[in-house]
Amino acid sequence: MPTSNEMIRNARERFNKAIEDKDAATIRMLLAPTYHIVTGRSDQNHGAGEEAARWAGVFQSDPTAIYIRTTREITINEAWGLAEELGNWQGSYTLAGKLVNASGVYSAKWQRARNGDWVLQTEVFTTIEFDEGCVPPEPI
């Protein structure tokens, strides 16, 4: 039986592979129903269905879009079925006809589901490096 750490790392790899394969259905399966994201540009989405639809839109509008999340560390509360993942992300996409790159750090909260799988509750991405032409978030 895999450890919780291995299960979370495997789920992250499935998420990366789903992005590579443009597979929004698999992404949805990895998310808690009340999933919440704050993107690297500070956009926010709530709910597994909304997030899967957002990915489907990205895949349809920009076939060059690719994002990879690389886990640095995972801290697990086995008794409560909670975990925090910290890592680095990198992405590239087409903007105004030009391929641009961005990268940064992320934090993810995982929760063990009733069936024993680990699903993402929330992810927060912070952009640290970016190519000229990347669009920053609007000020709050």
Regions found by a protein language model. Name each.
Residues P137-I140:
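Class I (Rossmann-like) S-adenosyl-L-methionine-dependent methyltransferase catalytic domain
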